[in-house]
């Protein structure tokens, strides 16, 4: 979805039964990151994931792509089993590190009337 700044990515899994009457849960995540400076403090290039001592290092690797993936995978598995009790709408933006205004605007103006902030 186009916004004044960065796009808002929206996807949805519908409830396995009675989706039109099921509540909708929103899972929010972001794909932007803080600047990598100062570069001299990095032990490896910030945008090249590197494993050291069993840990993954890269700019943005822990904030919050993994958490959103877990929610996405769980919803997909429940949907595949016919066991998803609610609609799950995933929203992901590129503005969280700078205020996240587009997600707020979307929630307040959702033309489907399904979400309200």
Could you say what each language-model-derived stretch is?
Residues 1-61, 78-88, 94:
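Acidic/His- and Gly-rich active-site-bordering loop/insert found
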Residues 64-117:
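Acidic/histidine-rich catalytic neighborhood of metal-dependent amide-processing enzymes
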């Amino acid at each position: 979805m186009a916004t004044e700044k960065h796009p808002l990515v929206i996807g949805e899994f519908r409830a396995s039964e009675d989706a039109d009457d099921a509540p909708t849960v929103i899972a929010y995540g972001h794909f932007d990151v803080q600047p990598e400076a100062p570069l001299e403090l990095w032990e490896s290039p910030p945008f090249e994931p590197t494993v050291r001592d069993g840990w993954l290092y890269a700019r943005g690797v822990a904030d919050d792509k993994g958490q959103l993936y877990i929610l996405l995978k769980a919803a997909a598995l429940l949907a595949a089993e016919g066991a998803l009790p609610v609609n799950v709408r995933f929203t992901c933006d590129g503005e969280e590190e700078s205020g996240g205004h587009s997600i707020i605007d979307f929630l307040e103006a959702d033309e489907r009337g399904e979400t309200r902030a």
